[in-house]
C-alpha cells in the first residue's frame, strides 16, 4: 500500500506509529491511584467535582482539579516521593506477607519498602526490589494472591459492593484486588466500577455492617 503524505510532511504510516506510541505510553502500569486525597492540594477527591485522572510515567494519579496536574509535573520525582510515602503508610498495616516476595526470606527490621505501580512491596534488600521493577506484572499477581488468601477468611461484605447482589447461598464470587484489598464481586465487570472510585469502595470495607 502506498503511503500518502499529509500536512507537516508526515505519512499515514508515520501518523499511525505516533498514535500507537501515544496510546501505549498512556497505559497505566500497576494499580489505580489508591489515595483519597489530591497529592498537591491535599483536598478530598471529589470535593471539587470529578477528579482529574492522569497517567504519569506509567502510574495513575488523581487530582482535585486540572491546575494541580502541572504543579505535580514540575517535579515528578519529588511528587511521587510524597505519594509513595502515603501509600506505604496506608498499605503497610495490611501487607499480607511476612517474607520477601522475591527471595522468600523473612522480613526483618531492615526490610525495604518500595512502591511500584501504586502498590507497596516489602523486600529483604534493594536488589530484590530491582527484580520487581524488572517484572512488575509477575510480582503483582503474586501479591494479589497473597492478599486474597489473607483477607478471604475475614471478608465481611455479604453482597457485591457494586451491584448489591447477594454473594451467599452457594454463589461463587469473583475475587479481585484493588488498592491492596480484596473485593468479592458478582462478576468481573464490576471491577471497573471499583477502579473508577476506589476510595468509595474501600470505605465500604471499613464499615461492612451497613452493607
Predicted regions mapped to residue ranges:
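Intrinsically disordered, low-complexity terminal tails/loops enriched in metal-binding residues
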Residues: 4, 21-211
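N-terminal secretory signal peptides that target proteins for export/translocation
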Residues: 1-8
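Bacterial N-terminal signal peptides
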Residues: 9-22
Amino acid at each position: 500500500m502506498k503511503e500518502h503524505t499529509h500536512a507537516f510532511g508526515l505519512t499515514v504510516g508515520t501518523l499511525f506509529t505516533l498514535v500507537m506510541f501515544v496510546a501505549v505510553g498512556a497505559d497505566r502500569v500497576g494499580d489505580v491511584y489508591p489515595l483519597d486525597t489530591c497529592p498537591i492540594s491535599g483536598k478530598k477527591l471529589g470535593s471539587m467535582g470529578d477528579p482529574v485522572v492522569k497517567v504519569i510515567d506509567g502510574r495513575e494519579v488523581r487530582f482535585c482539579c486540572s491546575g494541580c496536574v502541572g504543579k505535580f509535573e514540575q517535579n515528578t520525582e519529588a511528587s511521587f516521593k510524597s505519594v509513595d510515602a502515603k501509600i506505604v503508610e496506608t498499605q503497610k498495616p495490611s501487607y499480607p506477607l511476612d517474607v520477601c516476595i522475591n527471595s522468600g526470606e523473612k522480613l526483618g527490621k531492615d526490610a525495604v519498602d518500595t512502591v511500584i505501580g501504586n502498590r507497596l512491596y516489602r523486600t529483604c534488600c534493594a536488589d530484590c526490589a530491582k527484580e520487581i521493577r524488572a517484572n512488575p506484572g509477575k510480582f503483582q499477581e503474586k501479591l494479589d494472591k497473597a492478599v486474597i488468601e489473607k483477607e478471604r477468611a475475614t471478608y465481611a461484605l455479604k453482597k457485591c459492593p457494586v451491584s448489591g447482589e447477594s454473594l451467599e447461598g452457594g454463589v461463587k464470587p469473583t475475587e479481585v484486588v484493588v488498592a491492596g484489598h480484596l473485593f468479592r464481586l458478582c462478576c468481573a465487570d464490576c471491577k471497573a466500577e471499583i477502579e473508577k472510585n476506589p476510595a468509595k469502595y474501600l470505605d465500604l470495607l471499613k464499615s461492612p455492617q451497613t452493607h
